Design a protein with these regions (language model features):
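N-terminal glycine-rich FAD/FM-binding segment characteristic of electron-transfer flavoproteins
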Residues: 1-260
C-alpha cells in the first residue's frame, strides 16, 4: 500500500503576522513550521504504516527551503519525500496550487492521498478537494478518524454538531483535521536518517498533463486585494458598584454606544 501525504511549510502565525507591501505574507520574516492539519494527516498515515507496513511518501510545493519540513516528516517516519519547486509556480492561488500538485501526483503510485483540511496561512480548505477533482478521486473531508478496511477506508467525518461514518474505495483523498491525533515526535535516529536521505526535487518539466496557463501567478483566478493583521480588542472595563448603580451605568454605556 502506498500513501502520499501532502504537507506545507507555513509561517508560525502565533508569533505575529508580517506582510509585504503587496499584501502577501512576508514569509522570510517569520518562523516556518509544518502546517498543523498536515502534520495530523502525516501521523494518520504513519499509524497506518505501523499497522500494515504501508509506504509513506510526503510531497510539498514551495521554495527550496521547504526541504526542512520534508526532512522533519522523514524524521517522524516517512519513507520518501518529493519537493515541487520552480519560479514559474510562484504566486499560485488554490486553483494553481492544486493543479500543480495534481500534475506531480500523476507521476506517482498511490492508494491513499492525505492532505490537511486547510493551511493556517490561508484557511481556505480548497486545495484538497480541488486536487481530488483534478484527478477524479473520491474525497472525504474533515476526517476525525481514519481506518483501512481491505481496499477501502472508513472515515469518521466531523460536522458542526455530529459525526458521519463514511466508506470509500481506494484510491481516494482524505483531508485531515488537526484534532485527528497527537503527532509523534522526531526520534534521534529518525533525524540522522532524514539527514542522510535524498529529497526528490521536481520542477515545471516534471508535471504531467498541466498547461502553463494554469500555473503560478498567471494561472491564478484570484489575487490578494488587501491583507492585514487582526485588530486588537480593547481592554475590558471593571466597575465595582451596587446592583442599582450597575444597572444605571450599563444602560448609560449601551446608549453611549447606540446599542439601545
Amino acid at each position: 500500500m502506498n500513501i502520499v501525504v501532502c504537507i506545507k511549510q507555513v509561517p508560525d502565525t502565533k508569533g505575529g503576522v508580517k506582510f509585504n507591501p503587496d499584501g502577501t505574507l512576508d514569509r522570510a520574516a517569520m518562523l516556518a513550521i509544518m502546517n498543523p492539519d498536515d502534520k495530523a494527516g502525516l501521523e494518520a498515515a504513519l499509524r497506518i504504516k505501523d499497522q500494515t507496513g504501508a509506504k509513506v511518501t510526503v510531497l510539498t510545493m514551495g521554495l527550496p527551503k521547504a526541504d526542512a519540513v520534508l526532512r522533519e516528516a522523514m524524521a517522524m517516519g516517512a519513507d520518501d519525500a518529493v519537493l515541487v519547486t520552480d519560479r514559474v509556480l510562484g504566486g499560485a492561488d488554490t486553483w494553481a496550487t492544486s493543479t500543480t500538485i495534481a500534475g506531480a501526483l500523476r507521476n506517482m503510485d498511490y492508494d491513499l492521498f492525505i492532505t490537511g483540511r486547510q493551511a493556517i496561512d490561508g484557511d481556505t480548505a480548497q486545495v484538497g478537494p480541488q486536487i481530488a477533482e483534478h484527478l477524479g478521486l473520491p474525497v472525504i473531508s474533515y476526517a476525525a478518524d481514519i481506518k483501512v478496511d481491505g481496499d477501502s477506508v472508513i472515515v469518521k467525518r466531523q460536522y458542526e454538531d455530529r459525526y458521519h461514518e463514511l466508506k470509500a474505495k481506494m484510491p481516494c483523498l482524505i483531508t485531515a483535521l488537526s484534532e485527528l491525533n497527537e503527532p509523534r515526535y522526531m526520534t534521534p535516529g529518525g533525524i540522522f536518517d532524514a539527514c542522510d536521505k535524498e529529497v526528490t526535487v521536481w520542477g515545471r518539466a516534471d508535471l504531467k498533463d498541466v498547461d502553463d496557463s494554469d500555473l503560478g501567478l498567471k494561472g491564478s483566478p484570484t489575487k490578494i486585494a488587501k491583507a492585514s493583521d487582526k485588530v486588537a480588542k480593547g481592554a475590558g472595563e471593571k466597575v465595582n458598584l451596587d446592583p442599582a448603580e450597575s444597572v444605571a451605568y450599563l444602560i448609560g454605556k449601551f446608549k453611549e454606544k447606540h446599542i439601545i
